[in-house]
């Protein structure tokens, strides 16, 4: 695929500077280290460094031209003969639009659904992918764990990729035959305009609870970042194309803003039941084997049977079905396909030992819960697995929102019978100080152990748990690394739990 530079600029409404050459472009890149001949360098401002300031290096490496912002131009002023286009603020929005235009607007060539919220994004996107494929739609998934579409699958490096890579992935998925795509859209991606240039056919708001306040500074700013997904130019205007969880106060606020352009989803019952919810569930029966019930929608209602655990997964199910109904998929086939979805790695995942007698060891669950709301949901979902004791192993990440540390500790103390506080990803913070911040939220009288070494903490919890107890290891889920300082070292909660279970059986 090639495009002429002048045509590309005009396609997004940018003027062509006088005297600018008009080379043929074969690629676009935001990384000056990966440019080659035929490349348009897109200088993206970053949190620490303005990528546009590397335009000279990009041109020296073979880039045909560079697009930069006013700040980069002030740092490294281009001369009249340089192949540089200076765009106005917001630079990131122009970068996204240029990348989308280069790849011929891939998001407009299939039905792209965006999912945002503090918790539930990964499970909901995987559910949407599973259900869509089950009813015969060729589907692409872009998310925290993996990016995949027909005949292609690669582990993801970001929840939402940067614009140059994201638009290339969308184009590849469309060329591979994907008819529908589903994307996790983080608040960082929305605030940094990584999805600028995307056109979403549908959107889901899962919930909003405290997280990332080190970045957004306030819940109001966090909410407004998420809300960008539900308005033009990202979400197509017209009939209802969004599904919003109104059991979340922030979701109720968003739904009020959207009016008839969204379907409201709710699990509230009795006097709390949301009469105006288009999507709801009734006659629910939950057990350690999963959940059964009736799903009600504007397209009809029917029975479903799911092996997923926890009430929070019911909202994930409800919203996944709802947004696919908005895209015209049939309710009976969607309900049938729910039974075959076994979950997502690192989300309430049970650690099992082959050939082991389950009655001789505790039940061990690994979950990604790393926010107050997420930890509360995971603990409540774990409780039905035991009539005995529930142990919670968790920590809090360094260099991140400190306000949630004591909140998570209080939740663990309230809902678990025993708490083991340990390290998560300490990053550049003192691990002992993080532990002190967490322990400050644990009431006196709580059975609590503090162990800075996460592997030792997991082993200790499993060794001391009785058969029939449940040990919930929370915080890292699918992650196979731990961030110590500025380095990543291999670490997997599931591997450590399996090792501890084997050691227990071996005596």
Swiss-Prot record:
Pathway: Cell wall biogenesis; peptidoglycan biosynthesis. InterPro entries: Mur-like_cat_sf (IPR036565), Mur_ligase_C (IPR004101), Mur_ligase_C_dom_sf (IPR036615), Mur_ligase_cen (IPR013221), Mur_ligase_N (IPR000713), MurE/MurF_N (IPR035911), UDP-N-AcMur-Glu-dNH2Pim_ligase (IPR005761). One of its GO terms (biological process) is cell wall organization. UDP-N-acetyl-alpha-D-muramoyl-L-alanyl-D-glutamate binds at residues 32, 159-160, 186, 192, 194. The gene is murE. It is found in: Cytoplasm. Transmembrane segments: none annotated. Belongs to the MurCDEF family. MurE subfamily. The modification N6-carboxylysine is found at residue 226. Its EC number is 6.3.2.13. Meso-2,6-diaminopimelate binds at residues 400, 424-427, 475, 479. This is UDP-N-acetylmuramoyl-L-alanyl-D-glutamate--2,6-diaminopimelate ligase. ATP binds at residues 117-123. One of its GO terms (cellular component) is cytoplasm. Its main location: cytoplasm. GO terms for molecular function: ATP binding; magnesium ion binding; UDP-N-acetylmuramoylalanyl-D-glutamate-2,6-diaminopimelate ligase activity.
